[in-house]
């Protein structure tokens, strides 16, 4: 199990494939994605890596977090997240993960906080059909109707679909296809929409319901590894 990455949602656009078909994509940007800390079985009881992305002002960073980043020899980060990994995919502290961590055609799971819609009625929140527009209807056009039953059971069951706060929840969209990556600019283009507003931090992981492509880098797509491969290619030429 490899580590995921933290990316920032820039927005949506479209690209064209080899067949000339237009594909809607969401652009995710990775900015200075470094390994900040490790979690090991001996010390923590499980194996994981803590990643940090972005840049935070030193004056806005607490003294404890300054020491945490200094220990890893990385600049203060705007966002931290932890990813469980297998022991053979544990990464060293301080290394940078690039967009080449994913390959075109790979399936990924994307996690983000959905856009908040405020207090919404059942027609918007749960796609209810509503009531009649006329013919005896009295100000219940968009109402949900009955909520309970009779004396037995004499209550409203938990989970009843009703009006309430919509959005602003943690959402994971599974099996999204990676269309392409741009390591130089740190961009990942995925097919379709992902949860979250523009500028939101998104967690991208290998899909749990799809196999990992054979050409996916292990333990991760690292910045130093990319440079080494480029140097080796130039030397061979």
From Swiss-Prot:
Keywords: Methylation, Ribonucleoprotein, Ribosomal protein, RNA-binding, rRNA-binding
GO cellular component, one term: cytosolic large ribosomal subunit
Listed Low complexity bias regions: 220-237
Coiled coil residues, start to end: none
Ribonucleoprotein in keyword set: yes
GO biological process: translation
Bias kind Polar residues: ranges: 135-150
Pfam families in the cross-refs: Ribosomal_L3
Region called Disordered, residue ranges: 133-155, 213-237
Reported modifications of this chain: Methylated by PrmB.
Residues with N5-methylglutamine modification: 151
One Gene Ontology MF term: rRNA binding
Main function: One of the primary rRNA binding proteins, it binds directly near the 3'-end of the 23S rRNA, where it nucleates assembly of the 50S subunit.
Subunit field text: Part of the 50S ribosomal subunit. Forms a cluster with proteins L14 and L19.
Family, as annotated: Belongs to the universal ribosomal protein uL3 family.
HAMAP family on file: Ribosomal_uL3_B
Name the UniProt record assigns to this protein: Large ribosomal subunit protein uL3
Organism for this UniProt entry: Brucella suis biovar 1 (strain 1330)
